[in-house]
A protein has these predicted regions:
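N-terminal cap/lid segment of alpha/beta-hydrolase-fold proteins
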Residues: 1-25
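Conserved alpha/beta-hydrolase
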Residues: 44, 49-75
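Alpha/beta-hydrolase active-site loop
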Residues: 79-99
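Alpha/beta-hydrolase fold nucleophile elbow
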Residues: 101-113
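Alpha/beta-hydrolase-fold enzymes
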Residues: 110, 116-195
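Short beta-strand/loop motif that positions the catalytic acidic residue
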Residues: 227-229
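Conserved loop-alpha-helix segment in the C-terminal half of the alpha/beta-hydrolase fold
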Residues: 231-261
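Catalytic active-site module of serine/aspartate enzymes centered on a nucleophile-bearing elbow/loop
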Residues: 252, 256-293
Length: 293
């Protein structure tokens, strides 16, 4: 079970709902901060968080601005600070967690999809906050944005565009091969809502900075980065965009960058048919980067 709290965003005063899973066997070995994706919410990570608890990690998540309990009846409204405020919230929450848990416990940032874009931005300015970063369902945002801009005029808009290459039972088959997981997403009132037309462009706005070698060079060279996705994820372009993203970090001087692709897996690798494999791999990577085997 998670416990719920909140903090006030320094960006514009928005109250950000937080969740904590802290039932570790024995003393914790580390802390994981989760930054979720667009049109979902923090409590969807309950199964993953409990698995990380079993591996010795305390887990914290949020409902980002415009999402879940943070948004209430205003889903999709990112507030006056917009997506830049969401990025600032990720950094602020990381600093709060670092202060709460102290220097003795390593703090890792796990960002999925939109949350991974925020993580990519946050580590440019605040890489000293975290002991390692995992980017799930991510992409080289500038290249992906360019591909989206070149889509045919009659192509589906919003999240529906990502389902073009998949069967169309619900319109969200691009998320997972597991029909039960897709159905749970569709049934969740805090998931899959209509994305306001200004949101997608706002997510793409940081793209030039995320591709700028001078900006990436600000990331500390000893920050471990794991990029993990399904190779059938539309954002991955068969893995090509993830390899390019990983190479950018290497070229910027980051020494420990790994790219892990799961064959045939789709966007939400934590909710895929091979989710136990993915969760085990993530837990093993985390433990390895705490100095534990």
């Amino acid at each position: 079970m998670s416990t719920t709290s909140s903090f006030q965003s320094n960006a514009d005063g928005t109250r950000i709902t937080t969740y904590t899973w802290a039932e570790t066997p024995g003393q914790p070995v580390g802390v994981v901060q989760i930054s979720h994706g667009l049109a979902e919410h923090g409590e969807r990570y309950d199964r993953f968080a409990r698995a990380l608890n079993a591996a010795g990690f305390i887990v914290h998540a949020v409902d980002h601005r415009g999402h879940g309990r943070t948004a209430g009846d205003n889903l999709g409204d990112f507030g006056s600070a917009g997506f830049s405020g969401l990025i600032a919230d990720v950094a602020q929450f990381g600093a709060l967690l670092r202060a709460q848990h102290g220097p003795q416990l390593p703090l890792f940032l796990f960002g999925h999809s939109m949350g991974s874009f925020a993580a990519q931005a946050a580590i440019i300015d605040h890489s000293s906050t975290w002991s390692g970063v995992i980017l799930s369902g991510s992409t080289a945002l500038d290249l992906f944005a360019a591909a989206m801009a070149n889509a045919p005029a009659d192509a589906p808009a919003g999240l529906a565009a990502f389902n073009a290459g998949f069967e169309h039972r619900t319109g969200y088959e691009w998320l997972s091969r597991d029909a039960a997981e897709v159905d749970a997403y569709v049934a969740d009132p805090w998931c899959g809502w209509d994305v306001p037309p200004d949101v997608i462009p706002s997510l793409f706005a940081p793209a030039p900075r995320l591709a700028d070698p001078a900006q990436l060079a600000r990331i500390r060279s000893d920050l471990p980065i794991l990029i993990a996705s399904g190779d059938a994820d539309p954002l991955a372009a068969g893995g090509v965009l993830l390899e390019q993203l990983g190479q950018r970090y290497r070229d910027a001087g980051v020494a420990d960058v790994a790219v892990k692709l799961y064959p045939a897996a789709r966007h939400e690798i934590l909710n895929e048919t091979n989710r136990d494999e993915v969760t085990g791999d993530v837990a093993a990577w985390l433990r390895a980067h705490t100095g534990l085997a």
